[in-house]
Design a protein with these regions (language model features):
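Short N-terminal binding/cap micro-motifs at the start of the first secondary-structure element
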Residues: 22-24, 162-163, 397
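Generic structural motif
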Residues: 14-16, 257-259, 382-388
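A short, structural micro-pattern
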Residues: 19-21, 198, 256, 401-403
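Active-site histidine-anchored catalytic micro-motif
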Residues: 111, 116-375, 379, 392, ...
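Short secondary-structure boundary/hinge segments and terminal tails
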Residues: 102-104, 270, 397
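Acidic, low-complexity/disordered tracts enriched in E/D and polar residues
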Residues: 1-49
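Long, Lys/Arg- and hydrophobic-enriched amphipathic alpha-helices
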Residues: 380-416
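Long, charge-rich, low-complexity alpha-helical segments
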Residues: 31-127
Length: 416
């Protein structure tokens, strides 16, 4: 009871239980080092606040007893609470490090990057998934872009259920004729290191087949920007921002589509300093290397951005609850629109100037991929322009909203 308890791990998801009959806080590991999901009852929540690495089990017992109106909490119950958190990988302890190292080694040894969200975000059965995607694509009229100047599209990475109209609007612009291209997928790395970019050689395996990585291009990029790149980044194993794009690409183009998946870490330094992201030498070198690749490969590449926009409400640390397309979200839509105008104009600096004040209070998690794409296009396709195909907002829970949309990009003026 007198030894210090390891601190609660950073980076775990802590959210209110959505089930009225089971109140409390839910703990979940987005890195999937542990598969456990724990419910912390209301009376035990005060213990989480003092799991700082210096508190003892006696300190926890005292805090819990005080929070429960002076009613003594048994020491064996406190011990069970601590052991459960530790054994399930939620404390910064040796048990967690073993779990983490084991998962990293599993990913390193695996021949492919296997679907993480099949069976939850979308069907795990190939026939059922194909049927679902065909239905999704019928939600919007078929509008394949016949322009040879089409450079790429941007789509959400929110749940396909919540973002289906935007996904369909983006991927309806694609056709099997693009199958010979390599699809450069710039996805948000929700869990990656700041100012870093995650690469992998592993094929993305989904129920529809394997999307092989263009390894030669990946190696060239990694070699030319070694300080900026994390090879075989474990974040690929758990990240959804690229996985969802691969599934839609496989339906829109071909199941064995060839990809160059790039996870873009948060550009925190630019938000902290107010200086453009490529003021950071790692970011600048990566963008230069990507632009060099794009210059050489030219029309052999097609660009896909897996990006969401604003994150507003209680889930994201805001004091008020919000509802999609109501109240405060009208102002958010107007501010999103101003940023999208700069994106479509190819105005990288104008986009950044709207994002960085107040360290991006709209919390656009697509900021990194969008900035990297715009800056790369400035190098190789300075006349590139975009068009907004659809804008949406969705209540990810009863109190919180995510905004997102679909865009297309052209080499030059947008066709009428």
């Amino acid at each position: 009871m007198t030894d210090s308890v390891p601190p609660l791990r950073r980076g775990i998801d802590i959210m209110r239980s959505p089930i009225a009959e089971s109140p409390g806080l839910i703990l979940r590991d987005p890195f999937r080092y542990t598969q456990a999901v724990l419910l912390i009852p209301p009376g035990w929540i005060p213990a989480l606040a003092i799991l700082n690495g210096t508190s003892t089990q006696l300190d926890l017992q005292t805090a819990l007893s005080r929070a429960n109106g002076g009613q003594m909490v048994r020491s064996e119950d406190v011990q069970h609470f601590v052991h459960t958190l530790r054994d399930q990988g939620f404390l910064d302890s040796e048990e967690f490090y073993r779990m983490r190292d084991s998962r990293h080694e599993q990913f390193r040894q695996s021949a492919a990057r296997h679907s993480t969200h099949a069976g939850s975000a979308y069907p795990a059965d190939a026939a059922e998934l194909t049927r679902q995607l065909r239905e999704d694509f019928r939600i919007v009229p078929p509008t394949h872009s016949l322009s040879r100047k089409l450079l790429g599209v941007a789509a959400p990475h929110v749940s396909p259920f919540g973002g289906v109209e935007s996904y369909a609007s983006a991927y309806q612009r694609l056709a099997p004729e693009l199958g010979a291209r390599t699809f450069v997928i710039l996805g948000t790395s929700h869990y990656g290191a700041p100012e870093k970019f995650g690469l992998t050689r592993k094929a993305y395996s989904t129920p529809l087949g394997n999307a092989e990585v263009d390894v030669e291009l990946m190696e060239r990029l990694a070699t030319n920007a070694p300080e900026a790149v994390t090879r075989e980044d474990y974040c690929h194993a758990v990240e959804h921002s690229i996985e969802f794009q691969v599934v839609f690409l496989q339906q829109a183009v071909r199941p064995d589509v060839r990809i160059l998946p790039i996870l873009c870490g948060p550009l925190w330094d630019s938000l902290r300093t107010g200086q453009p992201p490529d003021s950071h030498p790692q970011v600048a070198r990566f963008i230069e290397a990507l632009a060099e690749l794009a210059t050489v490969e030219g029309d052999r590449l097609f660009w896909v951005l897996g990006v969401d926009m604003a994150h507003i409400g209680a889930r994201y640390g805001d004091a008020v609850a919000v509802t999609a397309n109501e109240g405060r979200m009208h102002d958010i839509a107007a501010r999103d629109s101003a940023r999208l105008d700069r994106v479509c104009a190819g105005d990288t600096r104008g986009f950044f100037d709207l994002v960085h004040p107040n360290q991006d209070e709209l919390k656009w998690c697509g900021y990194s991929p969008i900035y990297v794409f715009l800056r790369t296009m400035e190098h190789v396709r300075p006349n590139a322009r975009g068009r907004l195909l659809r804008y949406d907002q969705w209540n990810i829970d009863a109190q919180s909203v995510v905004s997102f949309g679909a865009l297309e990009f052209f080499d030059g003026a947008v066709p009428v």
